[in-house]
Design a protein with these regions (language model features):
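Extended catalytic core of nucleotide-activated donor transferases of GT-like folds
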Residues: 3-73, 82-83
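Acidic anion/phosphate-binding donor-loop and adjacent secondary structure
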Residues: 60-61, 101-118, 132
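Donor nucleotide-sugar binding/catalytic pocket of nucleotide-sugar-dependent glycosyltransferases
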Residues: 75-109
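Conserved donor-binding/catalytic core segment of Leloir-type glycosyltransferases
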Residues: 112-132, 138-142
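Aromatic "clamp/platform" in nucleotide-sugar-dependent glycosyltransferases that forms part
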Residues: 194-195
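Short hydrophobic beta-strand element within catalytic cores of glycosyltransferases
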Residues: 211-215
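Conserved acidic donor-binding segment of nucleotide-sugar-dependent glycosyltransferases
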Residues: 226-236, 243-246
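A charged, aromatic-enriched C-terminal amphipathic alpha-helix characteristic of glycosyltransferases
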Residues: 247-279
Length: 279
């Protein structure tokens, strides 16, 4: 925004704001929330662009209700997936789906080689929310103890109730170079996460050149990954999905190596919308 010659402020205290960008309708650390934005819009005629990044589907029904109400009053809405739009039940025409995208660093270490001798599966999550799929990851950690054809690498938060015993585990880190290198060393990206409005982790896995085995109830995830892997509905199907991708690895690998989306492309479309509404 600044590079495009615009001024950016983080409060509604000014009286000359040309456009409001709402990325969360809940109160911020200044106590400003969507109602504050709407009051400003009514008083000054300032349009609101609202990005719906969280639909509240991970145990926040009050957020779901709030988003459903606030999108009625925004001038333009950006959803990270068609699934998110449908969950909110939005039927207006003033919206666009702009999928999330990975940082360029996640493309830097991808390998074109076939699988390792032992199939290396990886995932990464920063939230301990149960809907990230920890019950299935726990099952997988126990499964690999007696199935040496497969290994599992986990990066990020893991609920303290069960820590992995047979997997390679790395605690959360903000080092994207480390994360992208570790993911790229593996063969298949796994996600058991459900009802994700805009799942970044799978996009990072795809950018690293890994086919994806994903939960069919993943929300945006089948939308993002459908061309690059296999879906599942149970632990048994998850294992079968890993075997399917491994057995036909060249096909899935060739497909995912064609995934080239990056953050700058998404940002460019955001800027076009901002310029259109602020002109």
């Amino acid at each position: 925004i600044v590079d495009a010659g615009h001024e950016l402020v983080y409060s509604l205290a000014d009286n000359d704001i040309d456009l409001i960008f709402c990325f969360d309708p809940r109160p911020n650390n200044k106590g400003e929330w969507y109602q504050t934005m709407l009051n400003y819009k009514i008083h000054h005629g300032t349009p609101i662009i609202q990005r719906v990044g969280d639909c509240g589907t991970h145990g926040k029904p009050e957020l779901t209700s709030l988003v459903k109400e606030t999108v009625k009053h925004s001038n333009f809405i950006i959803f990270p997936s068609q699934w998110a739009c449908e969950v909110i039940g939005y039927e207006g025409a003033n919206y666009e789906v702009i999928p999330n995208a990975p940082l360029p660093i996640f493309h830097d270490f991808k390998r074109a080689e076939s699988t390792n001798k032992k199939v290396k599966v990886v995932t990464h999550h920063w939230s301990p929310n149960p809907k990230k799929g920890y019950a299935l990851y726990e099952q997988l950690d126990k499964y690999i103890a007696n199935n040496d054809w497969l290994s599992f690498t986990y990066i990020g938060q893991w609920p303290i109730a069960y820590l992995p015993k047979n997997s390679e585990y790395y605690k959360p880190t903000g080092d994207n170079t480390f994360i992208s290198e570790k993911i790229s060393e593996c063969d298949i990206y796994l996600t058991a996460s459900e009802e994700e409005a805009g799942a970044n982790h799978v996009l990072e896995g795809m950018a690293c050149g890994l086919p994806v085995v994903y939960h069919n109830n993943g929300g945006s995830i089948p939308e993002y990954c459908g061309k690059y892997g296999v879906g599942f509905d149970s632990f048994e199907q998850m294992i079968d999905g890993i075997k399917e991708v491994n057995a036909n690895y060249s096909k899935y690998k060739e497909s995912v190596l064609g995934y080239e989306d990056q953050v700058p492309k998404a940002v460019s479309r955001y800027m076009e919308i901002i310029n259109e509404l602020s002109s």
